[in-house]
Amino acid sequence: MRNKSLDAAKAVAACLVVFIHVSFPGQVGQIIKVLARCAVPFFFMISGYFCYYEGKTAEDKIPSKILHILKLFFISLLFYLVWEYIMKFLSGEDTGEWLKELTDSSHLKEFALYNSTSVVRAHLWFLPALIYCYAVDFFVEKWKLRKAAYCCIPVLLAMLLWRAEFCRFFGGFYHTMEYRNFLFTGFGFYLTGQMIHEYQDKMYQCFVQKHTERHIKWLLIVGMAAGAALSILEYSFQNAREIYLGNCIAVICLFLWLVLYGKEKKISPILAEIGRKYAFLIYLLHPAVADVMKKISHHVGIDSSLCYLWLRPLLVYGITLGMIQGVFTLNMRLKDCSRR
């Protein structure tokens, strides 16, 4: 039976990604953005969770997942190439220079090594990173190295936090793409989700037998709260970062809670459907909606209105979701008509 709490959490995570890219105003907006940084690790964890298979079926399933994400990436890339060209043309920017940048060898190298898509749209990096995760996982399964891969989780997460955060205390510095890529931000969380899936039944049985399931539930809730508080504390000392130690603690505790106890909760079917069907598309399309809203708000003169700035992230999420649902509904009706 599918765990609908994970689907609902995907809908919330998609909303948090919108809050990262289209933030609320002031210091409150920055704190919300800090807490929202757990959304991308969550997406990698849930991808790994649903890519765990018993027996030998993994080698059959993973290639189809790679092809699906590859198709999604090429469609998204084509869309944003056209979209960015139109936006730059309307803004009076040099589109010819931008087109040259697209084929610059340094950008192509950054894409191949670090999944960087900044020259088109930065948020698209997630898709090639996920493809890399699936590809590496294919060989992990093929060569039966899953247990060895699990041993790499703390190493990968430690290297992520070192590059993203702690190296600054010792005068070090890494560019965002040097840690926001499949290996450091992606694969560690992907494997964590996969490992949780493999051992979820054993963990729950162990807690039930020892009569500690209630204590574990509250321990995970405390872990989520402590992780969120630590993230805010880290922000107060270091300002904005791509990810914090507190985010890692919070998202792992949240994921464990959803897997072990989420099935017990009554979940909104609408929220679960949004997460299951539309979360990835919201992630991909919301920047385009934000661009249109920015131009319209500037044209009508409300772009500096405090009321509008507070409503803007919610409007971007709502409009993006409404457009996607509209396209899905229209597509279903067209299919029904063709069958008749």
Listing of model-derived features with the role each one plays in the protein:
Residues Y134-L157, M195-I221:
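Solvent-exposed interhelical
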Residues R2-S5, P25-I32, S118, F170-R180, ...:
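Membrane-interfacial loop-to-transmembrane-helix junctions in polytopic alpha-helical membrane proteins
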Residues F19-S23, Q27, A158-G172, H197, ...:
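C-terminal ends of transmembrane alpha-helices
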